[in-house]
């Protein structure tokens, strides 16, 4: 099984990258949390890898941190959650926010993630609550967690997109088209902004 790849970033997109390792190009699926930390194409890159083996395909999923990889592996261990949905969950929620939602049973926030209904959210909490506590990512709170301020989210997304090479004026225009909700996360708004910028 491939657990780590180090090489040069040959191509990147919000859904997958191609990593050149000694002349061999590996297609690696990634969450947005990994995408917006990538170097420019041609830059050096090392990714933690989860290898998914099926009868008809072998897919690689890459993460910048071991923590994200462990979260991904916990998610796909839940009945009804496959690699694609797990990647989507990580794309729409930061690790600490996801852990908080699971530990505190925040079904509303979990259900707001695309692809997750109430039943799946309940199953995630039931199966992962104690495991999240052991990872030490969450900060249990009696009243649940407080969503990041809307302006703080916009500022973080603006900074991330500028680092990706987009001009500030173009990003500001894209952000003006978005409606940031109370339960929004940086990853979710980033994903929405990228859709607008890539039209």
Swiss-Prot record:
Annotated keywords: Cytoplasm, DNA damage, DNA recombination, DNA repair, DNA-binding
Entries under NCBIfam families matching the protein: ruvA
Record note on domains: Has three domains with a flexible linker between the domains II and III and assumes an 'L' shape. Domain III is highly mobile and contacts RuvB.
GO biological process, one term: DNA recombination
SUPFAM superfamilies: DNA helicase RuvA subunit, C-terminal domain, Nucleic acid-binding proteins, RuvA domain 2-like
Gene name of the encoded protein: ruvA
Subcellular localization: Cytoplasm
UniProt source species: Citrifermentans bemidjiense (strain ATCC BAA-1014 / DSM 16622 / JCM 12645 / Bem)
Location of the region described as Domain I in the Swiss-Prot/TrEMBL record: 1-64
Name of the protein: Holliday junction branch migration complex subunit RuvA
């Amino acid at each position: 099984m491939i657990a780590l790849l180090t090489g040069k970033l040959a191509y990147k997109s919000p859904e997958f990258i191609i990593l050149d390792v000694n002349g061999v190009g590996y297609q690696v699926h990634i969450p947005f949390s990994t995408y917006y930390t990538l170097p420019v194409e041609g830059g050096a890159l090392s990714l933690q890898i989860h290898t998914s083996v099926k009868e008809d395909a072998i897919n690689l999923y890459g993460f910048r941190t071991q923590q994200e990889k462990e979260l991904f592996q916990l998610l796909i261990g839940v009945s009804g959650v496959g690699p694609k949905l797990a990647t989507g969950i990580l794309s729409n929620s930061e690790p600490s926010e996801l852990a908080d939602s699971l530990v505190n049973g925040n079904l509303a926030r979990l259900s707001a993630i695309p692809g997750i209904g109430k039943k799946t959210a309940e199953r995630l909490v039931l199966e992962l609550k104690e495991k999240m506590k052991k990872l030490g990512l969450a900060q249990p709170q009696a009243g649940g967690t407080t969503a990041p301020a809307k302006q703080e989210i916009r500022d973080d997304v603006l900074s991330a997109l500028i680092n990706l090479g987009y001009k500030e004026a173009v990003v500001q225009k894209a952000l003006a088209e978005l409606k940031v909700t109370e339960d929004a996360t940086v990853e979710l708004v980033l994903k929405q902004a990228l859709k607008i910028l890539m039209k």
